[in-house]
Amino acid sequence: MLDKNKNEWAESLENRRKMTFDADSTLFTSVPPFPREITLDINNRCNHKCFFCANPKIDHYDSLDTDIAFDLMKQGIENGCTDLALQATGEPFMEKRLPDFVAEGKRLGYEYVYLNTNGALATPKRAKPVIDAGCDSIKFSINANNKKEFEEVHGYDDFDKVTENLKWIFEYRNSQKIKMGVY
């Protein structure tokens, strides 16, 4: 039995090798399915300097052009995409057009529009328009159990501010009976 499994395993590896390296393989001629989710890097600016992130080393800061962002969103929907993430290397709440991006994603028909944030800028003034635009979830990257750890990880003493913002978002969501994930 062991020898049979070894042979099947070896044959499987040989078949994979042939598919990968043989010129007549269909591996490189087939088109993979369009992804279910797209992530738009709407900006690459951040208000924190987390020790694990490459962002503090970026020497050029920019934002994604609105027309390009909306066109990419449209292409995603046209190709069967269902989820839209509005973040990547930057802090989404540094982007003044964030509510517009969320609203456009929902208008186009994305089932799930979300963002990740360090939470320091997710103030009621900035978060309310994003929530009201239809954001399906806001994920907080707190990365710490207490104030001291937070400062060590994030490079700033914003722990109290982040927890206040998180609490406000929970309260607003619950008071308005909004179906939105907060993580």
Model-derived features: positions:
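Radical SAM/AdoMet-radical enzyme domain recognition
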Residues: I58-Y183
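N-terminal pre-core extensions flanking Radical SAM catalytic domains
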Residues: M1-K57
